[in-house]
A protein has these predicted regions:
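Mid-protein regulatory/catalytic core that forms ligand/cofactor-binding pockets
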Residues: 82-134
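Basic, amphipathic "hinge/linker" alpha-helix immediately C-terminal to the N-terminal HTH DNA-binding motif
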Residues: 36-55
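N-terminal helix-turn-helix DNA-binding core of bacterial DNA-binding proteins
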Residues: 1-12
């Protein structure tokens, strides 16, 4: 992806995205190529998967334990996913019974960033719909 596409997708000023990319490069989370495309490094991919993990675990918590509807939890999870404590996230996962999917049916990466890939769409559909049918 390039800076222009990223700024359109995020609905941000290109200068803002350029500054964000600069900071990500400093942290070695992204690299840019000669054609100006931006790609996650392995470190960046792992970091992204861990954020996705936190986000999806929080969505499960909000739906299962606090009785939010599955379509209400995304913005709340956006805020909660930035909690830095790995121990808290591990305890949250254990408290939730090690769920494999979020309320939308998307797989939750494990603490090593691995995603279960051998899941058929029917099982994902059933899992996702069990949340809001309760």
């Amino acid at each position: 992806v390039n800076n222009t596409a990223l700024s359109k997708a995020l609905e941000l000023n290109p200068a803002t995205v350029l500054e964000m990319v600069r900071k990500l490069k400093e942290k070695k989370l992204v690299v840019t190529s000669a054609d100006k495309s931006i790609q996650l490094t392995e470190k960046g991919k792992k970091k992204a998967l861990l954020i996705i993990r936190k986000h999806r675990l929080w969505e499960v918590f909000l739906v299962e334990k606090l009785q939010f509807k599955w379509n209400e939890v995304h913005m709340l999870a956006e805020q909660l996913e930035h909690i830095a404590s790995d121990d808290m996230i591990d305890r949250l996962e254990s408290f939730l019974g090690h769920p494999g999917f979020d309320p939308h049916g998307d797989p939750i990466p494990d603490k090593n960033g691995k995603i279960k890939e051998n899941i058929d769409k029917f099982n994902k559909f059933i899992f996702a719909n069990n949340f809001w049918m309760n």
